[in-house]
């Protein structure tokens, strides 16, 4: 592979979709003479998720460019990083990573025989390597070591010495793996510049560094193994993929922190060179895109609906995940997964002051500040065809400005003067330039044609009247929900419309002092 490419063509393939390259001139000089030697390392900690397809797709690019690629399973690093992988599980998690990474590569058509796989402990425990760790520790300052690991090593109030060693070992790996370049996420940049500064101090060459952008998670922040809501696991079922994508942040016209759109850019396009948006015939039918820029432009101009984008990504993603699911469906692989991550599906945060046996923490629905609102005015968002801007009376001195994506589902005349259910303690968020100070709760059902209906408070309810969940009427709402805690997202999973059209959480009705909150027709619908 790469034989038919010029050095310039190889460089273009190596660097496409990267956010930054340090040492590009040196890379181009090497490519004129021989294949570039690159390594990518992954600490064997939490379960790999779909964002790992980003480096996998780049590894495919490296091989197409004729590079010699090494994949390092950094087992010792996993232990040094605040023992994210306990010593007794290190071997099992490393085996899990080996199996799942190889399955990912095979699912995108990467030939494994052209890759070199190695574990960190195969060379990091040698006499020579250990001596270099000591040599490095004699020239590195504590400040530089801590700064280098700030974006990668888990930050705690009282950092362990092991976390300060972590960047130095990653720098030494470049020398001991005999590579020209290290590839990683842009979150590794401080470690890369640390290596460029300190390897020459030991008499070793400064390496090239290739950095891919970090793909936003489903909630808009970085995709993380430790945040269940932010990522899709490689072994998630098709139903789980659908559920998580449905909840994913994908605001109409908004391309910032859009994990769904970023996945198309950094994984699906590099692998297939085209992407098909699946649409109903009445909305123009399927549309094939051969470059990401056109898709991004159409999404920005709201010619591509978030629901259609999610459905299309769901289909493409399941196609990638199916071979991995099949491999891990064997008894041997199921045992490995369970042994490497014992009780992973059952682990919950233990509330302060309780014991491990007190059961999983249940988030109190009274933390939500739900109120009756009355819509005083409705207008079209000036910069978004799918959004309304509403003025809503919630019993305060001034009405609240609320932005909602109901244009396609509810005519404006059906909203004007209507009593609604408003979530009032979300952090205000700008939507296409206008700050929304609440969320209008609606019931919805999926199908050939999505249906959406605003929830209805009991007749006679006054603006500002509190809405609570049956049995939780005495709790106090939070002043403002902290986005990182994802209180609403965790509760919303269990919001449903009952058979008798009542809004419920885990079978308990939404209530005011006048009765139950209802929905007109959408039995079994979800609420968001």
From Swiss-Prot:
It is an enzyme of class 6 (ligase). GO terms for biological process: tyrosyl-tRNA aminoacylation. This is Tyrosine--tRNA ligase, cytoplasmic. GO terms for molecular function: ATP binding; tRNA binding; tyrosine-tRNA ligase activity. A motif ('KMSKS' region) lies at residues 222-226. A motif (Nuclear localization signal) lies at residues 242-247. Its EC number is 6.1.1.1. It catalyses: tRNA(Tyr) + L-tyrosine + ATP = L-tyrosyl-tRNA(Tyr) + AMP + diphosphate + H(+). Homodimer. It comes from Xenopus tropicalis. The gene is yars1. Coiled coil: none annotated.
């Amino acid at each position: 592979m790469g034989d038919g490419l010029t050095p310039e063509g190889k460089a273009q393939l190596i660097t496409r979709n990267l956010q930054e390259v340090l040492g590009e001139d040196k890379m181009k000089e090497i490519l004129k003479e021989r294949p570039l030697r690159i390594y990518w390392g992954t600490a064997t900690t939490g379960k790999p998720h779909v964002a790992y397809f980003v480096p996998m797709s780049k590894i495919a690019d490296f091989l197409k460019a004729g590079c010699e690629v090494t994949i390092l399973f950094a087992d010792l690093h996993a232990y040094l990083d605040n023992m994210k992988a306990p010593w007794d599980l290190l071997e099992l998690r490393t085996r899990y990573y080996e199996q799942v990474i190889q399955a990912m590569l095979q699912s995108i058509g990467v030939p494994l025989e052209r890759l070199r796989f190695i574990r960190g402990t195969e060379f990091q425990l040698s006499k020579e390597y250990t001596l270099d760790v000591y040599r490095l520790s004699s020239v590195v300052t504590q400040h530089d070591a801590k700064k280098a690991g700030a974006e990668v090593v888990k930050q705690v109030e009282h950092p362990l010495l092991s976390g300060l060693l972590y960047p130095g070992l990653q720098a030494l790996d470049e020398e001991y793996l005999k590579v020209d370049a290290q590839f990683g996420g842009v979150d590794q940049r401080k470690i890369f510049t640390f290596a460029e500064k300190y390897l020459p101090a030991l008499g070793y060459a400064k390496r090239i560094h290739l950095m891919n952008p970090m793909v936003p998670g489903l909630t808009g922040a970085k995709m993380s193994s430790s945040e269940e809501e932010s990522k899709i696991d490689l072994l998630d079922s098709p139903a789980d993929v659908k559920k998580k994508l449905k909840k994913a942040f994908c605001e109409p016209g908004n391309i910032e922190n859009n994990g769904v759109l970023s996945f198309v850019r950094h994984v699906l396009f590099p692998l297939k060179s085209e992407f098909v948006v699946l649409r109903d015939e009445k909305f123009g039918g399927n549309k094939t895109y051969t470059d990401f820029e056109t898709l991004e432009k159409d999404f920005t101009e709201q010619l591509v609906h978030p629901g259609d984008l999610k459905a299309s990504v769901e289909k493409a993603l399941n196609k990638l995940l199916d071979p991995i699911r099949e491999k891990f469906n064997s008894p041997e692989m199921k045992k490995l997964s369970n042994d490497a991550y014992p009780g992973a599906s059952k682990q919950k945060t233990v509330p302060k002051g309780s014991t491990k046996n007190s059961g999983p923490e249940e988030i109190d629905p009274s933390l939500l500040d739900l109120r009756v609102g009355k819509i005083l005015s409705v207008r079209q968002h000036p910069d978004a065809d799918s959004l309304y801007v509403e003025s809503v009376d919630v019993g305060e001195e001034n009405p609240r400005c609320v932005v909602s994506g109901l244009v396609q589902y509810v005519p404006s005349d059906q909203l004007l003067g209507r009593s609604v259910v408003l979530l009032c303690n979300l952090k205000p968020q700008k939507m296409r330039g206008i700050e929304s100070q609440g969320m209008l709760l609606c019931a919805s059902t999926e199908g050939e044609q999505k249906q959406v209906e605003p929830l209805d408070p009991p007749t006679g309810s006054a603006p500002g009247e509190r809405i609570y969940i049956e049995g939780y009427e005495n709790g106090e709402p939070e002043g403002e929900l902290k986005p990182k805690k994802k209180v609403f997202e965790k509760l919303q999973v269990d919001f449903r419309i009952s058979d008798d059209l009542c809004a419920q959480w885990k079978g308990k009705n939404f209530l005011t002092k006048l009765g139950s909150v209802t929905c007109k027709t959408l039995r079994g619908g979800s609420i968001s």
